[in-house]
Amino acid sequence: MMTNKVSLSRLKLTDFRNYAAAALVLDERHVVLTGDNGSGKTNLLEAVSFLSPGRGLRRAVLSDVTRVGAEATGFSIFADVDGMDGEVAIGTGIEGDGEVVSRRLRLNGTPVKSVDELTDHLRVLWLTPAMDGLFTGSSSDRRRFLDRLVLSLDPGHGRRASDFEKAMRGRNRLLSEGRFDPVWLDGIEKQMAELGISMAVARYEMLGLLKTLIEGRAGNAAFPSATLSLAGFMDDRLNRPAVDLEDEYGLMLRDGRYRDAAAGRTLDGPHRVDLFVRHAEKNMEAERCSTGEQKALLVGLVLAHAQLTANMTGYAPVLLLDEIAAHLDEGRRAALFDLIHALGGQSFMTGTDAAMFSALGERAQFFNVSHGGITA
């Protein structure tokens, strides 16, 4: 399958993290950013991650992203992108002060209402050291990871998830106040059923596609294969018609009103799902694998999902890989770079030592980052 390339040709930051002003002029090649810890390498990756909907790879409070000491009250990011819909100039940042801070987006200089429109132009995926504990951490971290995987294939998923959370909070509030008004609750629960099943089915379908791709690559991959499954909501029933599932979940919510009121929360729904990952070759739960095996599993999973995104959209995603080479031996590093290059997209990688990326050769542009300054 022919994969089209999406690439950034220019990135410009103002009052973003430790950068008063910074600019990168890029070609289509991969980008390697090296420098000491704390110099601002990850901040550059975070800036690129803001070219996708959401709060970036750190899930930052937007007001915290503005440079300390900045005269203005916000930050701005500009990027020229050869994207899925041709060349586009993207500008994003925040406006407002104090309590009311909102993200703004311009495409080719024209304001747009929703940052979701970014997915018409590029898909951005990332892997950071903060994700290394994914398999041993909380189920909420794994759900967030799962939903980001879905989002790259189904851009409407994030909106449905936030609408579901909003409806669920409304139901919880009514129940906590003892207001069992059937008209109010029936309306909210109908909305929750439609949104919740839509979320659950989107996760189920994405995971099915990802499992098929991983199984097709098993045995000839540089990184171990993962076996994936979901549990916690409508297990083994998500292949049924959505209308039947909505009726079933709606009934579940109605029957659980008094129980949920006593618990102080909604006990059934897509917000209770967990992602289970096993090391396929060892038939072992990921959380029981060594730290090195967990990292290799996660790298393999993210690369497989990047390939799936390319297959499904026809465009390779932009990959952000923070400290990606730090815990890999030389052979596995070289294999990783070959896999990344074979995806056909542009990736941004960080590390403390440029020598760790030598296997990339001419396939990458190298930049040195030093406390707010960037040199080629």
UniProtKB/Swiss-Prot annotation:
Pfam families for this protein: SMC_N
Swiss-Prot/TrEMBL keywords: ATP-binding, Cytoplasm, DNA damage, DNA repair, DNA replication, DNA-binding, Nucleotide-binding, SOS response
Cross-referenced CDD domains: ABC_RecF
SMART domains, alphabetized: AAA
One cellular-component annotation, GO: cytoplasm
Listed GO biological process terms: DNA replication; DNA synthesis involved in DNA repair; double-strand break repair; SOS response
PROSITE patterns cross-referenced by the UniProt entry: RECF_1 (PS00617), RECF_2 (PS00618)
Major localization listed first in the record, in broad terms: cytoplasm
Single Gene Ontology MF annotation: single-stranded DNA binding
Record flagged with keyword DNA damage: yes
PANTHER family: DNA REPLICATION AND REPAIR PROTEIN RECF
Family to which the UniProt record says this protein belongs: Belongs to the RecF family.
Protein name: DNA replication and repair protein RecF
